[in-house]
């Protein structure tokens, strides 16, 4: 089992932009000295649900601050970016970091972003798949020469080529059943979202396993990642209230058609929020539902920085005891 961190970088009435960015930097430098495997940064546009619109830029900065931990994007939205530019940046970061860069990518979840970035909404899935094929060709071979419905240009070389053989490690966010099935056919590991229910994640995991088996994918080589929010306190109600305040605006924006209070309680119950027993029980259940080999943790809902560090230390001690 491997453990890492992810950063949402939400801003709200208690956390301003500068504080969110500074904490991400401080925690990254801190965990680089510990036993965590990787750090992934979330992409977001046009709202307070994240201040990072360019996760590859942030990844480059954080890679420069660190020595051993792997760092990359959590959900780089390839549908709304030019695939060649993504491939060039990924290869460059892979070279500069000598193989420590990770490319976590995603389809476009927010429908308002497609028209804003002048992308055809009616062909979103086809565009997503074509963008991936171009990026994958560039990362694995050093060249790309697409002849598709959306991109068509002569063969070009990636400069530089990737440092890592076959390119940096890639993950795709499990944003829909269609994306999960597509990823399973190609053997691309998933990142399960913290705000999806355990039931949804379980269905995605089962569907992935079934499709991957049909396509001859070696599931032993697939290292799915599970995102979990952490807010640990011996005062369980305090942890839950902090988490409610942290995620409320996000739920309203991203789950507008669901019952707000029900969704809020579902997320708090199924993530590691509360006292030690509640945190560990919720994490174990979520892991069982997904069958993942990797856990990505966010401690950002804990408003006190010292409490965040203490919680990180507890996880790090458990990694040393049980997973090394």
UniProtKB/Swiss-Prot annotation:
InterPro entries in alphabetical order: Alkanal_monooxygenase (IPR033924), Bact_Lucif_Oxidored (IPR050766), Bacterial_luciferase_CS (IPR018235), Luciferase-like_dom (IPR011251), Luciferase-like_sf (IPR036661), Luciferase_bac/NFP (IPR002103)
Keywords: Flavoprotein, FMN, Luminescence, Monooxygenase, Oxidoreductase, Photoprotein
Enzyme class of the recorded protein, top EC level: oxidoreductase
GO cellular component: cytosol
Superkingdom: Bacteria
UniProt-listed Pfam families: Bac_luciferase
EC number: 1.14.14.3
Any one Gene Ontology molecular-function term assigned to this protein's record: alkanal monooxygenase (FMN-linked) activity
One GO term of the biological process aspect: bioluminescence
Record's catalysed reaction(s): a long-chain fatty aldehyde + FMNH2 + O2 = a long-chain fatty acid + hnu + FMN + H2O + 2 H(+)
UniProt subunit comment: Heterodimer of an alpha and a beta chain.
Family: Belongs to the bacterial luciferase oxidoreductase family.
Function comment: Light-emitting reaction in luminous bacteria. The specific role of the beta subunit is unknown, but it is absolutely required for bioluminescence activity.
The protein's name in its UniProt record: Alkanal monooxygenase beta chain
Species of origin: Photorhabdus luminescens
Encoding gene per record: luxB
